[in-house]
């Protein structure tokens, strides 16, 4: 396979997680009887531009269906993050009623609702019908298409250039990263700013976050790779912030390469130096990741088998994509994890892809009173522990598997 950005031949493997169905392909009682589509889940490293990427097997339309079940608004932590983002950007870049904000991957309007509340004109791009409908219900204008240069040029022709674009947790989700990034260069006004948030590859590898790898994530990103890709597609990076979200993310600020309005800030240089010092521009950094992932898999499986032998009941919390990667890689089935609780009604009464574990409402947890609750979205551990603190009443304990097994 050739690199999605620079077309170099890919020869360095990062990890092989076997085969699994798309992580958001939840099953209904009807589809439970049919066979599922499994795709290999292998990740390779480009030794030229250092873009880390999944091997090509699945098409985008097989991964992001009309009933895609991830709704951003079901995480209170994420809503607070979005509200603060809008407040910070409004202040930093002097946005007002004469400005125009465009969000790519607007999801259910979780972020643009705060721009709308401030009276700033905004537009969302969201190719998934279920979440697009939820955003429209909040009064947000949505274009239901995949983003790229072609769509950006159409907006420009309609006079819809952007003062600010937001793209949160989507840069990793696009198969054609060059066309996607080029779209922002086309869409921005001359002095416009594009922000991108994505999980930081440095954390993924150093903290063993292999369960954030799934088919919908085509790319795993460092600032080193992103800066190179942006420069090749008409954008220059002028600032970067490190965020706690999703186990450690970056927010990258970019402008049109021909803008020259803002100097590159010290944060960019510092982070590039840190990535270089960690070895991210050398092959040895990426070797050994498979072994660390295998340990998590083995430790979780051993814990679940031991709990079963001891007659303990174990439930899961959070029917998240990362949980599906972990459970399928570890070969966990309903005999070891009886059910998974999720607050999102769109997921309830369905089944996790691959492992086919039933998804239920939280009420079920209170009635069943399990001995252990495995928190699958470990990045929300504190939020979930607060929300489910009542399991302590029956001496229930919380479990997370990543970066290492933790019970208590």
Outline where the language-model segments fall.
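Conserved class I S-adenosyl-L-methionine
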Residues: 97-107, 314-317
């Amino acid at each position: 396979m050739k690199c999605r950005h620079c077309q170099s031949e890919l020869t360095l493997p990062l990890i092989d997680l076997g085969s699994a169905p798309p992580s958001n392909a939840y099953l209904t009682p009807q589809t439970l009887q049919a066979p599922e589509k499994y795709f290999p889940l292998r990740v390779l490293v480009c030794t030229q531009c250092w873009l880390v990427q999944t091997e090509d097997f699945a098409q985008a339309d097989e991964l992001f269906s009309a009933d895609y079940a991830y709704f951003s608004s079901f995480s209170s932590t994420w809503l607070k993050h979005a509200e603060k983002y809008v407040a910070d950007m409004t202040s930093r870049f002097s946005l007002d009623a004469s400005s125009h904000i465009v969000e790519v991957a607007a999801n259910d309007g979780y972020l643009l609702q705060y721009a709308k509340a401030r009276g700033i004109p905004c537009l969302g791009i969201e190719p998934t019908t279920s979440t697009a409908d939820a955003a429209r219900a909040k009064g947000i204008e949505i274009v239901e298409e995949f983003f790229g240069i072609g769509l950006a040029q159409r907006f420009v022709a309609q006079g819809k250039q952007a003062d600010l674009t937001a793209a949160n947790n989507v840069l990793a989700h696009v198969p054609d990263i060059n066309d996607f990034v080029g779209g922002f260069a086309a869409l921005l006004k001359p002095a416009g700013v594009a922000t991108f948030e994505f999980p930081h590859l440095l954390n993924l590898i150093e903290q063993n976050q292999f369960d954030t790898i799934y088919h919908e994530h085509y790319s795993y990103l460092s600032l080193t790779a992103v800066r190179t890709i942006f420069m090749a597609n008409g954008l220059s990076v002028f600032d970067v912030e490190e965020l706690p979200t999703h186990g450690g993310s970056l927010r990258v600020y970019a402008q049109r390469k021909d803008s020259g309005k803002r100097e590159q800030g010290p944060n960019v240089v510092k982070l590039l130096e840190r990535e270089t010092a960690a070895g991210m521009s050398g092959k040895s950094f990426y070797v050994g990741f498979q072994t660390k992932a295998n340990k998590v898999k083995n430790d979780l499986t051993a814990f679940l088998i031991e709990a079963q032998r001891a007659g303990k009941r174990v439930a899961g919390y959070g029917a998240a994509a990362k949980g599906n990667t972990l459970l399928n890689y570890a070969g966990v089935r309903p005999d070891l994890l009886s059910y998974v609780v999720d607050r999102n009604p769109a997921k309830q009464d369905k089944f996790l892809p691959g492992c086919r574990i039933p998804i239920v409402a939280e009420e079920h947890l209170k009635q069943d009173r399990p001995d252990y609750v495995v928190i699958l979205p470990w990045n929300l551990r504190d939020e979930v522990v607060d929300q489910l603190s009542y399991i302590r009443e029956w001496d229930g304990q919380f479990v997370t598997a990543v970066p290492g097994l933790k019970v208590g």
